[in-house]
Amino acid sequence: MKQYLELMNKVLHEGAQKDDRTGTGTLSIFGHQMRFNLQEGFPLVTTKRCHLRSIIHELLWFLKGDTNVAYLHENNVTIWDEWADENGDLGPVYGKQWRSWATPDGRHIDQLETVLNQLKNDPDSRRIIVSAWNVGELDKMALAPCHAFFQFYVANGKLSCQLYQRSCDVFLGLPFNIASYALLVHMMAQQCDLEPGDFVWTGGDTHLYSNHLEQARLQLTREPRPLPKLVIKRKPESLFDYRFEDFEIEGYDPHPAIKAPVAI
């Protein structure tokens, strides 16, 4: 994960001081890209321990089309609690947009099902895209989508994915985002009888919060360790039938966790 540390170092040394929605303040750069070859290992940050349970359950929650934190709570995941209302609802966030995008004529589009069909039947299409950035529903969302738009690409029997993330919390959020989309690529590839290719991450406002700077400097003193390997133990009937116990990470030997506050 040298690319991740290089990005963190760049933000620390080149970032502009900016105010932000949370009132915390950031060091920020605009426009950055990283590429991860998924054949070389699963891109889970090793210079601090990442909570893999939360990453997997959050992705399964998205895939269910769910927008209430009840499922997450059932699985001891609290990463969305700060934004949920008193009933646990978040409004039409990622799961709703991925699985049930509302059209003006009253229909609902399952973008993931559409993408799966494209990958299987028209893999050379340049329109294999999922968007969570629904302008008409942004004001109903507890948090506007940060990882907003992703595209799949098939070549030489391998499935690659590029994500555009309009806003990126480099210290806390980005390790989750990289691992989550890498996991999704592995799952989609398995369902389409392809091999995982590259995950390409493209960031817009890419920032370190002012109360994460010391933690970032500590992390930069640590030497990256070998990437772990993802094992998917079975091939379910569909993308939407995976369970938490289907996934195993082999050889994950990270440095200790580094705590930092979430900017809300």
Curated annotation (Swiss-Prot):
Q: Residues that bind dUMP, according to the entry?
A: R21, R126, R127, R166, S167, C168, D169, N177, H207, L208, Y209
Tell me where in or outside the cell this protein is found.
Answer: Cytoplasm
The residues the record assigns to binding (6R)-5,10-methylene-5,6,7,8-tetrahydrofolate are H51, D169, A263
Q: Which GO terms describe its cellular component?
A: cytosol
Q: Does the keyword Cell division apply?
A: no
Residues of the active site: C146 (nucleophile)
Taxonomically, which superkingdom? Bacteria
One Pfam annotation, family name?
Thymidylat_synt
InterPro entries per UniProt: Thymidate_synth/dCMP_Mease (IPR045097), Thymidate_synth/dCMP_Mease_dom (IPR023451), Thymidate_synth/dCMP_Mease_sf (IPR036926), Thymidylate_synthase (IPR000398), Thymidylate_synthase_AS (IPR020940)
Q: Which family does it belong to?
A: Belongs to the thymidylate synthase family. Bacterial-type ThyA subfamily.
Function, as annotated = Catalyzes the reductive methylation of 2'-deoxyuridine-5'-monophosphate (dUMP) to 2'-deoxythymidine-5'-monophosphate (dTMP) while utilizing 5,10-methylenetetrahydrofolate (mTHF) as the methyl donor and reductant in the reaction, yielding dihydrofolate (DHF) as a by-product. This enzymatic reaction provides an intracellular de novo source of dTMP, an essential precursor for DNA biosynthesis.
Q: How does it associate, per the subunit comment?
A: Homodimer.
**What name does the UniProt record give this protein?**
Thymidylate synthase
